[in-house]
UniProtKB/Swiss-Prot annotation:
It comes from Lactiplantibacillus plantarum (strain ATCC BAA-793 / NCIMB 8826 / WCFS1) (Lactobacillus plantarum). The record marks 27 as: Transition state stabilizer. ATP binds at residues 67, 124-130. Its EC number is 2.7.1.6. It comes from the Bacteria. The gene is galK. This is Galactokinase. Mg(2+) binds at residues 130, 162. Substrate binds at residues 33-36, 224. One of its GO terms (cellular component) is cytosol. Pathway: Carbohydrate metabolism; galactose metabolism. Keywords: ATP-binding, Carbohydrate metabolism, Cytoplasm, Galactose metabolism, Kinase, Magnesium, Metal-binding, Nucleotide-binding, Transferase.
Length: 387
């Protein structure tokens, strides 16, 4: 999307002149899934598909928002002095929640604005459209109101918006991946300490293919909160004998020795995924740094197997994509990415095999599921910026 088209769309929506244009990426997670709320490591990166926003200040205290992706919602209007949650406000609760969380830090919004949003992420694909719009709003407010909030603080405000305002008990990964993204680099983040480092994603002759199930998933309505509470209960039982703060504190061997304390087969499976996936994320980062792409791919695949058997968040659509991908020539590894229950998977595929990969996996998916999957090459992007 180019800025002149976006500005034209803004003018058509609001019948006024736009002032600034911003972009905020989506994200994929290479490995380390459902570990961010268990004190583990994640290894995500921002991607070049995401959300564009066009902004113009107003002289009154009215805020008007319009999304090209949800035209039926029309122009949603509220006042800067009333930032209370309103279910009927739909998608605008994400930017409104960011305003509310920023206002709690003592910021006073002294004027309103018009905000036009246009995303090019597939709908419901699990590429973090909510974190993308939160951090888009963050950079827009930070710039438009000259707030001087650090990018890391905007990331934390984004998570608060999701948890406290929207009501989804998510970890920090999505906002961190979107907000702190760097071109061609993934981020190894320790969610226990918030220590992070950047790692170049050097895949040789391979590319990351995003595989979209085209099965919608709503994070708030999924079993996400259930899995989180299962892990919290498993941790509580382990803490009766172990001095640990999170499941991410344990090695695989330590977990195996102590698993009897959990005394519930389902809870053991959930916790085992969190512990083993954390170790996989650490090992995968090292493998990538060592140019050991075979090991990296094997760990990516092992992640999906664990998410299927132990965490049970994959479902037929994601399993069909991953399991079919594993059988294709030139594939190093494949897995679901994101919360699961639909959304997207990723595969590490030899560039020269991508066309055959899309055709073969696409055919099996269509024959098995009854509708098409979509495939895109992921390009790793910078975090939010003004265009």
């Amino acid at each position: 999307m180019n800025t002149s088209d976006l500005k034209q769309e803004f003018t058509e929506a609001f019948d006024t002149k736009p002032e600034r244009v911003f972009f905020s990426p989506g994200r994929i997670n290479l490995i380390g899934e459902h570990t961010d709320y268990n004190g583990g490591h994640v290894f995500p990166c921002a991607i070049t598909i995401g959300t564009y926003g066009v902004y113009a200040p107003r002289t009154d205290t009215t805020v008007r928002m319009y999304s090209a992706n949800i035209p039926d919602a029309g122009i949603v209007t509220f006042d800067v002095n009333d930032l209370s949650y309103d279910k009927a406000a739909g998608w605008t609760n994400y930017p409104k929640g960011m305003m509310d969380e920023i206002a709690k830090t003592g910021v006073k919004f002294d004027h309103g604005f018009d905000f036009y949003v246009h995303g090019n992420m597939p709908d419901g694909a699990g590429l973090s459209s909510s974190a993308s719009i939160e951090l888009l709003t963050g950079i827009m407010l930070n710039t438009g109101f000259n707030l001087g909030i650090s990018q890391l603080d905007l990331v934390k405000i984004g998570q608060k918006c999701e948890n406290n305002y929207v009501g989804v008990n998510s970890g920090i990964m999505d906002q961190f991946a979107v907000g702190m993204g760097k071109k061609d680099q993934a981020i190894l983040l320790d969610t226990n300490t918030m220590d992070y480092s950047y790692a170049p994603v050097k895949l040789g002759n391979n590319v990351i293919v995003i595989m979209n199930t085209n099965k919608r998933r709503e994070l708030a309505d999924s079993k996400y909160n259930e899995r989180r509470s299962e892990c919290e209960e498993a941790l509580r039982r382990l803490q009766t004998k172990l001095d640990i703060k999170s499941l991410g504190d344990l090695t695989n061997d330590q977990f195996d020795e102590a698993a009897y304390l959990i005394n519930d087969e389902t809870l053991i499976k959930r916790a085992r995924h969190a512990v083993f996936e954390n170790q996989r994320a650490i090992r995968a980062t090292k493998a990538l740094a060592d140019d050991d792409l075979t090991t990296f791919g094997e760990l990516v695949t092992a992640s999906h197997v664990s998410l299927h058997f132990d965490y049970e968040v994959t479902g037929k659509e994601l399993d069909t994509l991953a399991e079919t991908a594993w059988k294709q020539p030139g594939v190093l590894g494949a897995r679901m990415t994101g919360a699961g229950f639909g959304g997207c998977g990723i595969a590490i595929v030899d560039k020269d095999q991508v066309d055959a990969f899309k055709e073969n996996v696409g055919k099996v998916y269509r024959d098995t599921i009854g509708y098409d999957a979509d495939f895109y090459i992921a390009e790793i992007a910078d975090g939010p910026k003004e265009l």
